[in-house]
Amino acid sequence: MPLLDSFTVDHTRMNAPAVRVAKTMSTPKGDTITVFDLRFCAPNKDILSERGIHTLEHLFAGFMRDHLNGEGVEIIDISPMGCRTGFYMSLIGEPAEKRVADAWLAAMEDVLNVVDQKAIPELNEYQCGTYEMHSLSQAQDIAKAVIAAGISVNRNDELKLSDEILHKL
């Protein structure tokens, strides 16, 4: 099985909250697709709550589009990581990490402004596979933690695992 890009970086040295360009690729027509690692908490040290990350999934995707789409950028998808330490965001374009971090902080402020669980988009059995597994208060706790900590940048060249280490694993 091929080694995926996300497993070639040292998770023990990742900062969080932090933005990282996980991958950049070009389509046959010349469009640039960038995948960002939006790391909410430090791997193997903390984890996003099940209900909190699920509610963020519903809110974050729309709020990030509100703040980041435009000027050569269009978000394709934002999905939670299976390890529950963050989200992957795929988009068309190559926005700077600072622009992504600023949009992320603005989206977290938007999460704090949601006043009622009924305002969570697609919160029904027709549009959500586990529509009862949500917590606005847990999502807002996550947002508060991100805002309080601020968002840094993780750089691949600083996190790259050596070939020697990769062969041992």
Curated annotation (Swiss-Prot):
Keywords: Autoinducer synthesis, Iron, Lyase, Metal-binding, Quorum sensing. Disulfide bonds: none annotated. InterPro entries: LuxS_sf (IPR037005), Metalloenz_LuxS/M16 (IPR011249), S-ribosylhomocysteinase (IPR003815). Its EC number is 4.4.1.21. It catalyses: S-(5-deoxy-D-ribos-5-yl)-L-homocysteine = (S)-4,5-dihydroxypentane-2,3-dione + L-homocysteine. It comes from the Bacteria. GO terms for biological process: quorum sensing. Its cofactor is Fe cation. Binds 1 Fe cation per subunit. Fe cation binds at H54, H58, C128. The keyword Ubl conjugation does not apply. One of its GO terms (molecular function) is iron ion binding. It is an enzyme of class 4 (lyase). Homodimer. Involved in the synthesis of autoinducer 2 (AI-2) which is secreted by bacteria and is used to communicate both the cell density and the metabolic potential of the environment. The regulation of gene expression in response to changes in cell density is called quorum sensing. Catalyzes the transformation of S-ribosylhomocysteine (RHC) to homocysteine (HC) and 4,5-dihydroxy-2,3-pentadione (DPD). Belongs to the LuxS family. This is S-ribosylhomocysteine lyase.
